[in-house]
Amino acid sequence: MIISKNRKLVVGLEIGTTKVVTLVGEVLTNGKIKIIGIGICQSNGIDKGRINNLDAVISCIRESIHQAEIMANCQITSVYLSLSSKYINCQNEIGIVPISEDEVTKEDIENVIHTAKSVKILNEHHILHVIPQEYSIDQQSGIKNPIGLSGTRMQVRVHLITCHQNMAKNIIKAVEKCDIKVDQVIFSGLASSKAVLTEDECKLGVCMIDIGGGTIDLITYIDGSIQDSQVIPYAGNIVTKDISYAFSTSYSDSEKIKIKYGSAIKLSPGTSKNIDLSSKYGNFQKNLQQDTVIEVIESRYNELLHLINNRILYVQKKLYKEGRKYQLTGGIVLTGGASTISFLTECAEKIFQKKIRIAKPLNISGLTDNVTEPHYSTVVGLLHYGKEFYFDDTNQKREISFIEKWFQKISNWFKKEF
């Protein structure tokens, strides 16, 4: 957090496939976040979380941060950084320990979570998040906060989110070369869920789907706890590439066509428009029918949504075998830039057979005209996450303590290498 003229400021930085966004929020006395600065730069040098041109990424970060600093009238020294890639992995684990005294203490909780996370994870991966799902004391299960309760043995179920260490190192390196400290790296899907989901939805059971440019992030909450997280390495950009390939148009022209004429389902008969490429999108002497373009878009969106539904059904079957609750009474919540295409709600309802909501960031004030669109769910969520780190005395602080050692390892690696 940054202190500027007695203001408590938190900064989120999203380095995505399509854009680099810096968002500055002031944490008000009532705990709300007021947006006071934003910087946006078109991404260059990164694709689906992997850096392929470090200098280009650094340049984008600097430009984005500079814009936000001017608008917020502050100097940014540290950020909360989002991360999404196919190299993100998740697993649910269990830890069991005896209760040391007559009642559960914070030390008992630290011990049981340490036991739960001391498991084998993928090679070259580090634990990014350790998120408690529920505690059990002796025969009593479903406990959210066991502090002060009596018993002889405590069990915890946790959700682990891990990432490839080199992927994280490279993104952190890019930020630190801009003389900016990384307060914490946060899985993008987790950040987005903080921005768009309500407490009731999480308790009822909900799957949040953030459809970005390079990746789709999934987070599933059951009974208020995260049960599954997943990254699909295909998203909005592949739709643009399909249009480019099908109609021999440039990538930038295809993106414009997708945004202006795209739809996730076929149009009503007689409503298709003629797309004159020669006058609108360059020097092509070519016309397209909107229906033809939509066929390409609809096919790809159907494929992407079916991939997501397969994951949802897999998790449902797995939890059912474990004898655990699995209901998405809260439905499906879609967000991210690629969720704004026309008629996506209708398309998704056919595939998921559940109620669908297209979500914008919640619980913010200030420069809301700039960021209250699905495109900014992740970076707004980073601010909510950062705020909780400072003001929540329970779960968030416990989670942070478990990744401090990981950040120390990252820091030590930098010192050795550079």
Swiss-Prot record:
Record has NAD as a keyword: no
Gene Ontology cellular component terms for the protein in this record: cell division site; cytoplasmic side of plasma membrane
Pfam families associated with the record: FtsA, SHS2_FTSA
GO BP terms: FtsZ-dependent cytokinesis
Gene3D superfamilies for this protein: 3.30.1490.110, 3.30.420.40
Subcellular localization, as worded in the UniProt entry: Cell inner membrane
CDD domains, A to Z: ASKHA_NBD_FtsA
Quaternary context: Self-interacts. Interacts with FtsZ.
Protein name: Cell division protein FtsA
Species of provenance: Buchnera aphidicola subsp. Schizaphis graminum (strain Sg)
Gene: ftsA
